[in-house]
């Protein structure tokens, strides 16, 4: 019996060994079956990103579907962009860092998703959820952290700060009326906070590439990028024969080899190659025959057909938009006005807002009392208004002049070069909030005229032992 028991144990060990050898023989060559030490799975960094998507991104998507409409559509695009990033991170965990020339091509799927999200916002400026769309559009470039080194985390934070400018508007509009929007804001900002924590743990100084495996390229990484961001796949089966496109390319190479051989044979003739040239007589030389020069000028014209077609995307002229001045719901839309100094909005109500977009060299007067006014992407615009009960905002603009005839509690200036504000006697208690702007001046009425006061652009900060103290810097002339 003892001998029989020993024989059985030996057989079991032999079977186990054969099974392990069989598994090894079916593993694809190289390190494709092993990802950073995890056989048949994904790297810890990819697993952590999956958790971020399953929690924060999923929560944001759920809250966006509750709001529906443009917000839901936009959120689906964000989800798709995160899926593209997940595919890129999976590739980075399996391949070594690519050559510099291949980086742009590998990043293209993510950059296209970002562009799609930003384009959607631009096409829906009349949306009631425009602040929601803007918050996403301004911060979605944070997904470009994978190309930032040595500190991608602060880059994501900067993009997150850009989102808060618009999420604060959402909170201001809905915090007392519809808490669904408040939940939406929290879930969206949580994405970037968690992404910063993820980067700090797994990619502190920049995207971490695999130390083993082939070098990433557009060809070698195609299967990973096109596999989608689904659940981690099982261990791959034995690799099939090479794909047909490669065989076609090889066939083309074989077909072209005789022509290449003939070309090299001609080049190898050296000076003997000139023996095949035909002698040119004087009557065939253009510098001795004026009639040939005239013909030569004509014969060069067909080469113009080789110039890029005007239908190529790069040669499209900038699209000319039709000017707009209309009331849409409770929003006055003033868009794409140029060289107009007679724009007037006279029939206004307290709940109405005015949105002024991409107007140049124009003047607009708003009579009565409105809720708020936004000036966005305008140049050399003059605005005169009576009363605003909320806020006047100037964003991404240049050379703006604002004259307050009545009252306004707050004027906000952000990312603007050149803004001159003429206050009335009733508006002297107005608060001016500025960020990332220059050449700002407030003009105060005094003795029938205006006195100009510049808004500080330079500050000094010091530690007083318990907190930071910031005050305008005095620049001595």
Swiss-Prot record:
The modification Phosphoserine is found at residues 301, 309. One of its GO terms (molecular function) is actin binding. It is found in: Cell membrane. The keyword Hydrolase does not apply. Residues 230-246 have a biased composition (Pro residues). Its main location: membrane. It is a peripheral membrane protein. Pfam families: CAP_C (PF08603), CAP_N (PF21938), CAP_N-CM (PF01213). Residues 317-455 form the C-CAP/cofactor C-like domain. This is Adenylyl cyclase-associated protein 2. It comes from Pongo abelii.
